[in-house]
Amino acid sequence: MADPTSKDDHDGEGGRDKSSTFVQKLIDVEEAKTQIIYSLPMIFTNLFYYCIPLTSVMFASQLGQLELAGATLANSWATVTGFAFMTGLSGALETLCGQGFGAKSYRMLGIHLQSSCIVSLVFTILITILWFFTESVFLLLRQDPSISKQAALYMKYLAPGLLAYGFLQNILRFCQTQCIVTPLVLFSFLPLVINIGTTYALVHLAGLGFIGAPIATSISLWIAFVSLGFYVICSDKFKETWTGFSMESFHHVVLNLTLSIPSAAMVCLEYWAFEILVFLAGLMRNPEITTSLVAICVNTESISYMLTCGLSAATSTRVSNELGAGNVKGAKKATSVSVKLSLVLALGVVIAILVGHDAWVGLFSNSHVIKEGFASLRFFLAASITLDSIQGVLSGVARGCGWQRLATVINLGTFYLIGMPISVLCGFKLKLHAKGLWIGLICGMFCQSASLLLMTIFRKWTKLTAATV
């Protein structure tokens, strides 16, 4: 007698097979798993390092209104002129080390790391000189004199940490391109914990007050760099890619510059666009409300981008590794999966914002006016977060392929020739205020994402020459 459940079991298995086939057609599951497993540690790593200077600002902010304004202004200035630039410079290694690892030119990874550190050292000196004129620059920009003086004091003691941050970013890219990412979570979390304790000790126990916060940040960044550096030197995982210091690294500085400067420009042009929006908001009627709304939106976008950064790093590594191995088809497949994952990621964040916007804005302000204003902006913010997620992944493709120069031109044109003029027109001329500013940003981001997508589709995919990787 036949088993009466056999047909049901067969139908159930057939249904599962159909479902599995549909998912496989929609997205390469194995590639998606690889990228997700890789992205998660990078998300936490980026978040922990991001929180080191932020926690110091929080401690300084507790000392008074002047200290709050000075520390916040200093941190913003340090980010757009220093930390973001250093992060961008390290993007050269995503191309050089990523493709070198794929091509099995393992020794060259250590050489490129040293070249990148030389470049970081030179630019750190130049940026530090700029930082020592912070007060004059702020006064030139018509900032409050007392706040400018306080911010300049903060920058003075933050400057020693910039070099450590630059070196740290280079080592992160060096590890990232070899798919060694899980240990990075521990090496980023420990300095954050140390920074919290050090900041409290210097600000409150040692009696250093305001300057204790930036000193703690500098100390913590050096601890982060030295600890990760020792890990690379001592671990057997890097025995083929780190063979010691070499004078050969100086021969590759020019090559590094051809990629690192456009990569830094890519990052900074986008960072600066958001800062300009906050500045424009301060020029409007009711600047306290408009600035607060735009600042909350910018902070929300930045936090959301932390998630995209992890996926962008995974995309860059997968693309550069495949190109280095001569597998263009594999690189394109990785890109396709990354773009789909970016849409899923954006959808999750957007749903959270649309559903929980009231609770979210409550973390920043209890004002009913601010809450109502943010509610009216939430759909615009959802659009920009979606576009930012897509462009973040496509920018990762550009870094993996070595297309930084073209991507820089795209960012310059879309943000400053399209986005900003529309922001000014809608915000001031059409009197849409904060909405108008964000509409301009969305227009710029849409053009940016579309341009990067067209570049990805139509540009020829080739690896760098064997001599460079």
From Swiss-Prot:
Keywords for the protein's UniProt record, in alphabetical order: Membrane, Transmembrane, Transmembrane helix, Transport
Which GO terms label this protein's molecular function in UniProt? antiporter activity; xenobiotic transmembrane transporter activity
Q: Where in the cell is it found?
A: Membrane
Share an example GO biological-process annotation for this protein: defense response to other organism
InterPro entries hit by this protein: MATE_euk (IPR045069), MATE_fam (IPR002528)
Task: Write down the Pfam families for this protein, in alphabetical order.
Answer: MatE (PF01554)
- Answer yes or no on keyword Transcription regulation: no
How does the protein associate with the membrane? Multi-pass membrane protein
Membrane-spanning intervals of the chain: 40-60, 73-93, 121-141, 152-172, 183-203, 206-226, 252-274, 293-313, 344-364, 374-394, 406-426, 438-458
Q: Does the keyword Transport apply?
A: yes
Q: Which GO cellular component term is one of those annotated?
A: membrane
Coiled-coil regions, chain positions:
none
Q: Which NCBIfam families match?
A: matE (TIGR00797)
Family named by the database record = Belongs to the multi antimicrobial extrusion (MATE) (TC 2.A.66.1) family.
What's this protein's name? Protein DETOXIFICATION 18
> Which organism was this protein described from?
Arabidopsis thaliana (Mouse-ear cress)
